[in-house]
Amino acid sequence: SITELCKVLTTGPLNADTEVVVGCPAPYLSLARSQLPDTVGVAAQNCYKVAKGAFTGEISPAMLKDLNIGWVILGHSERRAIFGESGELIADKIVHALAEGLKVIACIGETLQEREAAKTEAVCFRQTKAIADKVKDWSNVVIAYEPVWAIGTGKTATPEQAQEVHAALRKWFTENVSADVSSAIRIQYGGSVTAANCRELAAKPD
């Protein structure tokens, strides 16, 4: 449960050099924020691209800030696939969230069919470019490489596969954004990460 997870993260101990952020469904954001120490961030799993208006069911960055939530996950593959969110919409969401003072975990990743067709880099670059076309300040953006075929399936990209994509993304940032952003931006891997495999994944340079 969320309460049990909060207890684990509160008692730790957590590495002081590691930033920890917990992504929660919207109804539990306040609960998680109230039970976690300030050193652990809380992220919403979605928000909309405008501050206010007639958008029934949507959550704005302003609402998240009212709950003292500092992070939001945007562009998750399930939002892209199930809810039909385009790269342009996701980029608009990211720009607005950043402008409102939130930090963003921006998700990219390929499907199994795209990987088998050797389109992994092309897909990841296209999704990243849609964001880069609109984002000018990357200091509060984390890129999350989440191959669709590894999310909730029990299949995990090998550390070598993840490193290959992360290195390619860093090179893309050097060539298309700037060397400074490329060296500074955090690129994390997500997709069936467990206690058994996290250390090996984290040991990779990118």
Curated annotation (Swiss-Prot):
Protein family: Belongs to the triosephosphate isomerase family.
CDD domains for this protein: TIM
SUPFAM superfamilies: Triosephosphate isomerase (TIM)
EC main group: isomerase
NCBIfam families linked to this entry: tim
UniProt subunit comment: Homodimer.
UniProt keywords, alphabetically: Gluconeogenesis, Glycolysis, Isomerase
Keyword Isomerase applies: yes
Catalysis performed (reactions): D-glyceraldehyde 3-phosphate = dihydroxyacetone phosphate
PANTHER family reported for this sequence: TRIOSEPHOSPHATE ISOMERASE
Catalytic machinery residues: H76 (electrophile), E146 (proton acceptor)
Upper taxonomic lineage: Eukaryota, Metazoa, Ecdysozoa, Arthropoda, Hexapoda
Enzyme Commission number, as recorded: 5.3.1.1
GO biological process, any: glyceraldehyde-3-phosphate biosynthetic process
GO cellular component: cytosol
This protein's pathway: Carbohydrate biosynthesis; gluconeogenesis; Carbohydrate degradation; glycolysis; D-glyceraldehyde 3-phosphate from glycerone phosphate: step 1/1
Protein name: Triosephosphate isomerase
GO molecular function: triose-phosphate isomerase activity
Superkingdom of origin: Eukaryota
